[in-house]
């Protein structure tokens, strides 16, 4: 499928949910998976920022089995009145020299082009859209109606932190996230192949999306098989925030997991060891999050 009408047509027939929502219960670990502790070689050798391989020990913890959904984030906003970064007035003192359209609240949105001149210029498919936010992830005229079980997007780091604090939880550190993505297996292979059980880009990025996995964009949570300890969508679908600062990019945090925009011809970060920086105050529509909490062995 190329950009434009064909992509929109396919999107209309996608599933709206794959897993039932987490039941309302007093169990503090409802909807979470226990990740046993262990020691492993963290990192990878594919891209420079993934090196060096280093031995890391992680204590056991609980982690959300899926990325936080629109429904879950909506419950947080309803309970607290929270306003996300993408909905607030833009602080032009922090970001001087912005063009006028970027001085309005909004988020960065993937817009599938019909053609591109190489893949070096990401502005060919990424656009800052005034009015885009978690309620309107594609901008004005879009909504999350009938998308309650899709992962919430257009979430800045501060927003993810606020939700986690409200739940009495935290964002995972990079080592915790990577260990969980490896299914707590120190011998998990560092595969370079495009994963079959993950929402990634099939075709020529960014102009042809064959959508062989049934999704031309983001999938509802839990549509693909979980990993060996029961965590869904750790690879693909959305990048995920971690609590760790990115060492060579001031004001940025480490994000992990790749997204539905990763393809063999572009990105190649659908691997547990992959990482990249993300500006903490930038809301985008290929990035979400999940939470963790310390606890005892179940």
Which residue stretches match the model-derived regions?
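N-terminal pre-domain segments of enzymes
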Residues: 2-26
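Functional-site microenvironments in short loops/helix caps that host divalent-cation chemistry
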Residues: 8-14, 34-35, 41, 89-276, ...
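Short, conserved catalytic-motif segment at the N-terminal edge
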Residues: 40-59, 140-143
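Short Gly/aromatic-enriched secondary-structure transition segments
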Residues: 47, 52-54, 74-79, 89-90
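Short capping motifs at secondary-structure boundaries
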Residues: 61, 76-85, 167-168
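An anion-binding catalytic pocket shared by soluble metabolic enzymes
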Residues: 64
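Acidic glycine-/aspartate-rich tracts in secreted/extracellular proteins
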Residues: 68, 244-247, 296-297
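Short, structured beta-strand segments at or near domain termini in extracellular proteins/domains
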Residues: 285-298
């Amino acid at each position: 499928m190329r950009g434009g009408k064909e992509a929109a047509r396919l999107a209309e027939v996608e599933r709206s949910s794959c897993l039932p929502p987490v039941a309302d219960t007093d169990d503090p670990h409802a909807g979470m998976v226990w990740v046993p502790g262990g020691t492993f070689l963290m990192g990878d050798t594919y891209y420079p920022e993934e090196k060096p391989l280093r031995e890391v020990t992680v204590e056991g913890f609980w982690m959300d089995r899926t990325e936080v959904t629109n429904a879950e984030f909506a419950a947080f906003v309803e309970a607290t009145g929270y306003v996300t970064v993408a909905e607030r007035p833009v602080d032009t003192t922090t970001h001087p020299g912005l063009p006028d359209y970027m001085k309005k609240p909004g988020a960065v949105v993937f817009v599938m082009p019909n053609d591109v001149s190489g893949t070096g210029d990401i502005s060919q498919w990424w656009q800052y859209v005034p009015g885009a936010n978690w309620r309107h992830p594609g901008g004005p005229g879009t909504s999350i109606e009938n998308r309650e079980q899709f992962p919430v997007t257009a979430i800045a780091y501060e927003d993810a932190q606020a939700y986690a604090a409200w739940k009495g939880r935290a964002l995972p550190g990079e080592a915790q996230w990577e260990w969980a993505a490896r299914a707590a297996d120190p011998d998990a292979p560092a595969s370079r192949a495009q994963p079959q059980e993950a929402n990634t880009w099939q075709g020529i990025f960014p102009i042809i999306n064959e959508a062989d996995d049934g999704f031309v964009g983001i999938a509802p949570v839990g549509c693909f098989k979980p990993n060996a300890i029961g965590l869904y969508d750790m690879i693909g679908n959305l990048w995920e925030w971690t609590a760790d600062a990115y060492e060579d990019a001031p004001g940025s945090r480490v994000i992990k997991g790749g997204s539905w925009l990763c393809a063999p011809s572009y990105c190649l970060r659908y691997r547990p060891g992959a990482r990249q920086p993300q500006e903490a105050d930038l809301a985008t529509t290929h990035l979400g999050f999940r939470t963790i909490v310390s606890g005892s062995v179940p």
